[in-house]
Design a protein with these regions (language model features):
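Juxtamembrane membrane-interface segments at transmembrane-helix boundaries in membrane proteins
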Residues: 1, 48-65, 127-143
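Signature of small four-pass
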Residues: 1-29, 61-123, 143-146, 150-164
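A surface-exposed beta-alpha-beta supersecondary segment
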Residues: 22-65
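Short acidic-hydrophobic sequence patches enriched in Asp/Glu that either
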Residues: 38, 99, 134
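Secreted/luminal cysteine- and crosslink-motif detector
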Residues: 47, 52, 76, 165-167
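Intrinsically disordered cytoplasmic terminal tails of membrane proteins
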Residues: 163-173
């Protein structure tokens, strides 16, 4: 049980770090504009070694930002619940923190999946046609890796919960 929780906690911490780095950096997409190399993230775009804030209030950027932030927050809440699941308090016997942590990691996975899917769909269908020579970059890829890490953290914590439930069911009362 503790090995599952330890593996889940490791995946969750790495996933949360990747979520923060992915959301905060400016390399979601790279392209050439007027012969110059440019790149953009969720908050800024950079051309000719100068970066500018994204001042346009475009719905897909706002949705992607919101889902990535919600994902990071729910992952952090899952990490707190996951750390608390190592301690056993008699007053919390009916509330299983391993299960709560697993659910929070799945919620985080869902939010990052929504954010990445929105960004991917709009980028391929709209921005991809606007810029001929473009590609997704490392910040974007970190978002997908973070999704996998939070998903596996959820799997590990749900497995730990199931092992705990099996032990409870077989122990004499």
């Amino acid at each position: 049980m503790y090995s599952f929780m330890g593996g889940g906690l490791f995946c969750a911490i790495v996933g949360n770090i990747l979520l923060v780095v992915s959301t905060a950096t400016d390399y979601w997409m790279q392209y050439r504009l007027s012969g110059n190399y440019a790149h953009q993230g969720l908050w800024r775009y950079c051309m000719s070694n100068k970066c500018y804030m994204q001042t346009d209030s475009i719905a897909y950027w706002n949705a992607t930002r919101a889902f990535m932030i919600l994902s990071g927050m729910s992952c952090f809440a899952g990490i707190i619940a996951g750390i608390m699941s190592f301690a056993h308090f008699s007053s919390f016997e009916r509330f299983n923190r391993s299960f709560a942590a697993g659910i929070m990691f799945f919620v985080s996975t869902f939010f990052v999946l929504l954010g990445m899917a929105i960004y991917t769909g709009v980028t391929i269908n709209f921005l991809g046609r606007r810029f001929g020579d473009w590609r997704f970059s490392w910040s974007y890829i970190l978002g997908w890796v973070a999704m996998l890490m939070t998903f596996f953290a959820g799997i590990f914590y749900i497995c730990a919960y199931r092992m705990c439930e099996c032990r409870r069911g077989t122990s004499p009362r």
